[in-house]
Structures are given as structure tokens and as C-alpha cells.
């Protein structure tokens, strides 16, 4: 069988090789033979074997297999149970034909098209808000449901961070308040010190003025005494 199939393939290839060449006009004694037309069949046109497209037998067998599988998939049997055919007067209806060797005899029907999908009714304006709210509530999912223990750990960490930040904020605020108090106290001390200095300076100035006045009075008294002594000496 293998030798015969290989020989058939070789002959088919040789035929295809012969058919691929077109007949050329033959020159006889330097002249073209265009006077008479030959009545021979043109092998390259494949009119004698029905192969106008020039396809290979392998390609034709492949296409036949594909068509057979496609038609077998399209054709469906309504009654899958094997029923014995009842004798009837009209035998012409019972006698049918088979498309392929694999097809089974029986009545065939085209499948009815599937019914169109039902469309949802358009909600009214009054009930649309409540229905949408209910749907949103049903569809709402929390992070704890999705993540589970990871979400709990994250929430605990965030809470710890928030508490730490709050404590740090309170500590910084207390420090700022203390600094403000100390700065205000220092400013008050400076003011008091300056006022004390001013008061001391004023007291010193007053003391100096009083001392100068006393000195001036003493000088005046001395001068008066000296004059009196001079006058007394003159009178003597």
C-alpha cells in the first residue's frame, strides 16, 4: 500500500509539472506555425479533469475534510433515539440520501433561533433613588472584608501613629508655652531691671544735685564770713 501511494503521488507531481508549462509556438525552418490551430486539448487549462484552479490532490483532500467536519457540526439531529421506521404508503418520503458516509438516516430539522434576551424595564424616577441606594448598600464592601487580618494590622498601626502624633503635638505645644512664659518672664525682668536702673540713675542725679546745692550754700556762707571778718578788721 505504501509503495502504490508513493507511486500515485509521484505521478500526480509529474502531471502537475507537465501542466505548469504553457505551450509555446514552434518555429519550423525559421517561420512561425500560426496558420493552423491545433485541435489538441490544452492540458494547462485543466478542462478535461475539472481542475481549473490547478490545485494539488492533497489540498483538495484537506478542503474536503474541513467541509465534512463543518457540515457535520452544522447539521443536528432532532430525535437522538433510534426509532424503527413505520411502514407507510408514501415510501418516497422514507427514502432519503446521505451527504457523507458518516451521516445517519433520519429526519432533520433546522434548529430554531434562540429567543432574544429580555431587556430590563426602565426604573421610574420616583423609585430609582431608593433602588439605587439599596443596590449601593448591597454592593458596598469594607476593606476589612477584603483584606482581613492585614486590614486590622494596618488600622492598628494607623491608630498608633495617630496617638504618637497627638502626644508629640501636645508635647511640642507645652514646650512652646513654656518657652513663651520664660521669654515673657525674661522680658519682664529686663523691663524691671531697666526701670530699676533708671530709678537708680534718677536717685543718683537727685543726690548729686542736693550735694551740689549744699556745697554752694557752704561756699556762700564762707564768703559771707570772710567779708564780715574783713569789715571787722577795717573798723579796728
From Swiss-Prot:
Motif mapping: Nucleolar localization signal (NLS1): 173-181
Keyword field contains Nucleus: yes
Post-translational modification: Phosphorylated by ck1/csnk1a1.
Recorded phenotype for the gene knockout or disruption: Morpholino knockdown results in embryos with small eyes, head, and brain structures.
Biased composition (Basic and acidic residues): 10-51, 156-165, 182-196
Pfam families, alphabetized: CUSTOS
GO biological process, one term: Spemann organizer formation
Amino acid composition bias (Basic residues), ranges on this chain: 214-227
Region (Disordered) residue spans: 1-57, 83-236
Sequence motif Nucleolar localization signal (NLS2), location on chain: 211-219
Localization terms from the record: Nucleus envelope
Assigned keywords, A-Z: Developmental protein, Nucleus, Wnt signaling pathway
Compositionally biased residues, Polar residues: 197-210
GO cellular component, one term: nuclear envelope
InterPro entries: CUSTOS (IPR026694)
Summary of the function given for this chain in its UniProt record: Essential for Spemann-Mangold organizer formation and subsequent anterior head development in the embryo. Inhibits canonical Wnt signaling pathway by antagonizing nuclear import of beta-catenin (ctnnb1) during embryogenesis.
The family this protein is said to belong to: Belongs to the CUSTOS family.
Note, other: Named Custos for the Latin term for 'guard' or 'keeper'.
Subunit structure: Interacts (via NLS1 and NLS2) with dvl2; the interaction is negatively regulated by Wnt stimulation. Interacts with csnk1a1. Interacts with ctnnb1; the interaction is positively regulated by Wnt stimulation.
Protein name stated in the entry: Protein CUSTOS
Provenance organism: Danio rerio
Amino acid at each position: 500500500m505504501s509503495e502504490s501511494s508513493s507511486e500515485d503521488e509521484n505521478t500526480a507531481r509529474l502531471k502537475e509539472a507537465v501542466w505548469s508549462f504553457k505551450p509555446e509556438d514552434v518555429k519550423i525552418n525559421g517561420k512561425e506555425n500560426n496558420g493552423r490551430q491545433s485541435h489538441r486539448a490544452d492540458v494547462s487549462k485543466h478542462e478535461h479533469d475539472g481542475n481549473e484552479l490547478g490545485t494539488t490532490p492533497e489540498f483538495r483532500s484537506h478542503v474536503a475534510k474541513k467541509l465534512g467536519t463543518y457540515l457535520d457540526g452544522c447539521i443536528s439531529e432532532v430525535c437522538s433515539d433510534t426509532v424503527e421506521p413505520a411502514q407507510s404508503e408514501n415510501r418516497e418520503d422514507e427514502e432519503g440520501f446521505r451527504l457523507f458516509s458518516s451521516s445517519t438516516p433520519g429526519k432533520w430539522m433546522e434548529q430554531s433561533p434562540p429567543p432574544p434576551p429580555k431587556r430590563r424595564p426602565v426604573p421610574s424616577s420616583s423609585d430609582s433613588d431608593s433602588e439605587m441606594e439599596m443596590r449601593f448598600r448591597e454592593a458596598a464592601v469594607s476593606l476589612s472584608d477584603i483584606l482581613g487580618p492585614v486590614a486590622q494590622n494596618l488600622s492598628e498601626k494607623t491608630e498608633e501613629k495617630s496617638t504618637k502624633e497627638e502626644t508629640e503635638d501636645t508635647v511640642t505645644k507645652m514646650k512652646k508655652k513654656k518657652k513663651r512664659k520664660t521669654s515673657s518672664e525674661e522680658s519682664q525682668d529686663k523691663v524691671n531691671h531697666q526701670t530699676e536702673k533708671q530709678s537708680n540713675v534718677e536717685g543718683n542725679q537727685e543726690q548729686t544735685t542736693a550735694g551740689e546745692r549744699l556745697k554752694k550754700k557752704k561756699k556762700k556762707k564762707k564768703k559771707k564770713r570772710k567779708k564780715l571778718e574783713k569789715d571787722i578788721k577795717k573798723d579796728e
